Amino acid sequence: EKKPGAPRTFQQDVSLHWRKRDWLLMLGVTLVYAVVALTNLGSMKAPQNPWVSSTRNEQVIIDLGEHHDDVTMLYFCQVSYSNFSVAVSEDGESWSDDYIADMAEGECFQWKYLTPSYMGKDKYGNDKRFFYSQPIKFSARYVRITSQQIGLKMNEAIFQDANGDRIPATVIAQLNVMEESTLYSDANNILDEQDTLEGLPSWWNSTYFDEIYHARTAYEPLHGTAPYETSHPPLGKVIMSLGIAIFGMVPFGWRVTGALAG
């Protein structure tokens, strides 16, 4: 018999006492979240094989097959640190003035149009090139791409006619190359994944907002390069790199782990 004032004793029970209904509710909520989060998360396609410039002034000449009017150019590049230029021609001999293509270091892993640009001053008074958003439309048969750096990594270029249809294109020359360089690559890589652009350039098929930092930083350790973004703790980017390792450097790949982690 328990004495008056004696402390009460309890048998510790650490089990959850979950019943079948509890498990079904949990799994149901998880399934609904997974469907909502993973549906339309991002494209499973993106160009993977780059042409890498082996010299500062390497050039690639592309033939569009015949004369076309109102041509627009899209391109998809990896991490690069300077712009490149594009010129057009009717005969492959006389070339237009160069258009400067935007490829600053934050413009990686996204589809971009070739657009007009102008030189101006930034907020600190330094010279800077500014780019408009409206695509350039040119009339020509031949296109010349010229790198402005060693190591420009262009995964793909697509040319569209006035109706937005892709123009079959062929690389006919690769000039100013250094074949003995470890960076040397076949310029045909620019045109070997034409089916990887789905729709128009958008969040669906490209990096956007902070992804230009975080997706890139998750990709870099997988390839033995120093991480670009170091202002945030690295664990999140390490988790992102798991998705990239499994699904590839595609929008779904760099977003899936964030979606699963909530």
What are these regions (language model features)?
Residues 22-36, 187-191:
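Alpha-helical transmembrane segments
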Residues 230-238, 246-262:
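Loop-to-helix entry region of an early transmembrane alpha helix in multi-pass inner-membrane enzymes
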